[in-house]
Amino acid sequence: MAWRPTDAGFLVCCLSSNTGCFCGNVDIWRFEMAVIDRVLVGEALVIEERPDHTGLDLYNVAHIDLIIGPRGSAAEDAFCRTLTDQKQGVNGLLAIVAPNMMVKPATVMFNKVTIKNGRQAVQMFGPAQRGVAMAVMDCVADGTIPQEEAENLFICVGVFIDSHADIDERIQDWNYRATKQALKNAVAREPKVADVLKAYKDSVHPFQAKK
């Protein structure tokens, strides 16, 4: 269970031992449960039509899957493994807003499809990285992720970059939007199971083969 300090105040304290119990008023930090007290999961997809209106922009679609959790949780273990276990075609990289300025909470990105060419790699390490990083920091700035918890949280973000992606501005903007929405969903524990049960039979997936 994770805790975080709030404002200082007076509480009644009872300390027991083999010799008895002492009770009295002491000035200590009050503690309340952390907002992010366990591993949370978030997902979001952003897609629009191609600029020439020929259909959905499947080349530049952003689909984010992420986990966020506190120090000591499986999220920290996953963060360390993702960052250090590099393989050909599958790589982990820290989310940074600029060189020498990694985001807080510490965030590692990984590609969900094999990187097949240099352009795709640059898109992952450029516009996608910037979009994810800015989304994380904006979630801290707007209070979605409490600032006082940020130093002790870890985020792992799966990013989809198609090998035919051709509009870097969309990669950056859509991965920003998808990451921000996924984080908000995770922290809010959305969607609720009752909502999924109510809607899933009538739902439509943009890439489904059939209804």
What kind of region is each of these model predictions?
Residues 20, 25-211:
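Accessory interaction regions appended to the cores of large information-processing enzymes
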Residues 1-32:
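N-terminal amphipathic/basic-hydrophobic helices that include classical n-h-c signal peptides
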